Amino acid sequence: LENILSMITVQTNLYFNKKNNTISVGKQKSQETIKSTRTKTVNGTVTDQNGEPIIGANVLVKGTTNGIITDINGNYSLANVTEDATIQFSYIGYQTTEVKANSKELARIILKEDSELLDEVIVVGYGVQKRSDVTGAISSVTSEKLNSTPSSSLGEMLRGQAAGVQVTMSNAAPGGSSNILIRGRRSLSGGNDPLYIVDGVPMTSIDDINSNDIASLEVLKDASSQSIYGARAANGVILITTKRGQTGKMKISYNTYAASQSIHKNFEFYNGEEWAALRKEAYYNANLSYDETDCFRGLMLDVFKSGEYVDWEKLMISSAWQQKHDILIQSGGDKTKYALGLGYFDQNGMVPNSGFQRLSGRLNIDHKLLKNLTIGTNFLYTKSWKKTADGSFNSFITMPPLAKVYNDDGSLREDVTEAGESHYNPLWNIDYSNNKSQTDRLLINFFVDWKITKDLSYRANGSLNTRTVHSNTYQGTKHTTGRNNNGKATAGTSFSNDYLFENIVNYVKDFNKNHHFDATFMQSVNVIEWKNLGINGTGFANDDLTYNAIGSANEYGTPTWELSDRKLLSFLGRVRYNLFEKYLFTFALRVDGSSVFGKNNKYGYFPSGAFAWRINEESFLKEAKLLSNLKLRLSYGAVGNQGVTPYKSLGLTDRYLTEFGDKTIIGYLPGTELTNPNLKWETSTSGNIGLDFGFFNGRINGTIEYYNTKTTDLLVTKSIPSSLGYSTQTVNLAEMKNNGIEITLNTTPVKIKDFRWNVNFTFTKNKNEIKKIDGQVDENGKPLDDVNNKWFVGYPMNVYYDYVFDGIWQKDDDIANSHMPTATPGSIKLRDVNNDNQITADDRVVMQRDPKWIGTVGTSFNYKGFDLSADLYISHGGTIYNPYLTTFENGGDLTAKRNGIRRNYWTQNNPSNEAPAPNMTQAPAYISSLGYQDASYVRLRNVTFGYNFPRALISKAYMQSLRLYMTLSNFWTKTDVQAYGPEQTPGDYPEPRTVLFGLNVTF
């Protein structure tokens, strides 16, 4: 397109200028006759700000048709130029530059990009809007930023990219997912996941989306921007727009990388000698013989004598490869444009028999049927396979080091110690099991855009979004569990179908240059169906076909069949008004009717309003040259959470079986929960104040946000008198509050000829507090807490509740007169929190699990074709429970039956104050108090070094761009959490450290 327009400029009396996504055309000023005398030829090079030559740039004698375009190296040579002429240099996407014909600057012309931050166009839901006109709190993340993190989880790619968004890895195994919180937790039982909208289609998960298909991602954080999605938007909204076709010659992009994954940790397990000493001490403290022949039974004694200990961590965990390949083809003409994306992702697991693969294909088409009528489609299909090792991760690495993995003939041993302590070889069960799942997603979206008049348009949007998950497991005839049933297989399939149809009307009108008005009206119907089928069978002739032979099982369990649906009828009205390009107003009302609500509360109403003032456009700041942007934003509104389980308002029945002779009669009776016809949505009402600022032509820019959110009518299960015939009822009673501050700062400290240095910061602080649970109070009128769910009025929702570790009792302590008079030296000392000289349930304390604040620091350097970037992620505060320090399964109870984290435990000769005395027969009392650790951490998430080859060098190979890069991901972590990752319990699959080599090429 650029080359064509450049040629037209040279050969006609027209000029072209691009602003945002609009190309304007105009007629040149009246031509002047080129004087035949005193003319010359001017030569030079046209480059961008990075020194890259611009191919096809327009070089024109102003006011004439005498012009030329630059060659493949950005060079030009323009003849017949008069001494007093002005040379005009232009290229679409760059600011036009004018230079006198006698200037020395002609030798090298540098064009600046014509893309200020304020003119960025972002998606706001049911339309787009210039960044400068936005009144709500919206964060944007580019595709390049997302793809800087090597992961199959789009949520993990989003971590640290937007203030107000907290991402935690729920499962780092291949194909694992992440939890995303936007501005804190807002529901006790209705879910806290945001709503995802992909090309206008709602989705419950984005892990099936190929990140390379994404053009932009927006996070809607305040009620004014969220309210257009009504009863589903209380936890925030993430809008994803995928790449579309473009007019002009075909563009082919290929992106690939290969990566090596490995574990990292900040703790050590006991080695063989240390574990043997621990076991002896545990026997001694249990008043058992700690002679070697008594302590080390079975194979343990042989290994102890030989010193050939097993390092289970090294045996079970190894480096693993990960690769990704993406192809994107974009093209189009005057009528039809298309984008075709194909992707393949493959991640091997670091433990045996685990891995994840995904194939994806996306096709987006836009076709102009008539001058004012466009149709299009978005098509997505993904298929993924996930393989999971049998057993939990902690069972792999906490086997005793005094063990034998293999028999003398090289075959696997089943019991690695033969000590009678159920030390089953983890490799054994992996060999005799098969656990796989397959996920298929199909999304088809059709739309029609009709430009009825200059100001009025209509869009019809219909979509089908289906997802099918097949989950299969098999425990073979030799598996330690499966052998009890001569093999056991399970097979389950879940189906979800999401149907959406929308009618959208837009009206846009400019009343002279000072008044801009636009209105959007929408009506939609959304139906979601979910089905789940499950079956299990036992008794197999052999293990050859694993779960595929479930049809030939000898016995079957009771099949399961579940189904549910949701229906949503919605209406939306939104009005935006721009006065003098300085005063911006937005008003919206969404109405949702949901099938899951009670019959007395079928419809929810969610209004919002917002105002923004572009202060820098005021006359009193027009001359403030250092100030490039200053905008104040205010918003207030309500959004909902329809987290009601389908049919909950109607009441559920329980199945009962009755025997009549040789027949079984199935019947149904009302369940234990009373129906509630008043059941409705949870409502979050939120106010937001934001300040956008920019200095030095955008070299310093950022945003400060403060919000205050009150969520009412939270769903809780309330106990009711049994005299009613029921025990519980789900009601809208609880209340919660969130408030916080968010800061985003982007700076360019250095910007010179060939060198650029950028630094960016984000800061997020959220305070969450439960204000009310079920309305019940004690005899003093104090609200009652829900200890079972760990919900406490006046505290955050996500907490631990336990005793406080205060050291280890020593021989010289006056134990008899203490608050724990029955304790013994070497046992755990608890803190007497209320100072009543005894340990009771009242000494337990509430510990916040979520961080107090999170932040990022990023920097990037660009020198000619080289670039270097780094991102630091900080999570401060919060608590994590570490079972490696407390439980038997994780070797933390100091009974010396399994291996665990090396501890400085108490002995007669080592009166430690860190961990109690080991005991073979009894775990230390109150040992759970040892498991709570400060969850703060600092992590170097990504370091990337890359090189972009000069266009002049690669253009001969028909390349537009070529980039090679290396990335170190999760390379360094500083934390006190003794685990493989500061956000995971040690039994979870570890988050890997990754070394990556990648290539991006465009033709």
Regions picked out by a protein language model, each given a short descriptive name:
Residues 1-362, 367-370, 374-382, 415, ...:
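Short, small/polar-rich motifs associated with maturation and membrane association
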Residues 100, 146-151, 193, 199, ...:
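Extracellular/periplasmic, surface-exposed regions of secreted and cell-surface proteins
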Residues 131-132, 228-230, 248-249, 263-265, ...:
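Switch/connector loops and helix/strand junctions flanking conserved nucleotide-binding motifs
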Residues 155-159, 733-737, 779-800, 846-856, ...:
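C-terminal extracellular loops and terminal segments
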Residues 253-305, 534, 731, 748-849, ...:
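Conserved small-residue
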Residues 268-270, 475-477, 535-539, 776-778, ...:
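Short Gly/aromatic-enriched secondary-structure transition segments
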Residues 301-303, 594, 875-964, 968:
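Extracytoplasmic gating/loop element in the C-terminal half of outer-membrane beta-barrel translocons
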Residues 849-881:
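Glycine-rich, aromatic-lined ligand/substrate-binding cores of catalytic
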